[in-house]
């Protein structure tokens, strides 16, 4: 999905950075490819401060950043739980969120449809919330599901 989304943005004149799971960078050829694409690794098993700082810097510089709110790939028609990282980064940098729905193809890179929603900003969380960015993360997922629903796709929200 990251490669498909990168290509869709790249072909429209953008060169986004990508935050990807560290496992993708273990193979030297894959590491070269993803680094060339502007990707950088995140260790999903812990609070990876290096990756978070890099992502915040990318956004503060006005660059686009591809990040999947679930933190992993999710099977078609299923839903992963939204992690709060994407929402936290958007709020802290004042960056807009561009929701994207990718309809998978039957074969690699064939039949995939990338649909962009309208950019939106997340509100700052209220003080004292247990998980201050959870509402924002859920809002991002709702926007993505709305795009899927508008395309007639089966989404976790109908």
In which residue ranges do the predicted regions lie?
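Catalytic core of membrane glycerolipid acyltransferases/transacylases, capturing the structured
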Residues: 1-46, 54
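Non-catalytic C-terminal accessory region of glycerolipid acyltransferases
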Residues: 50-158
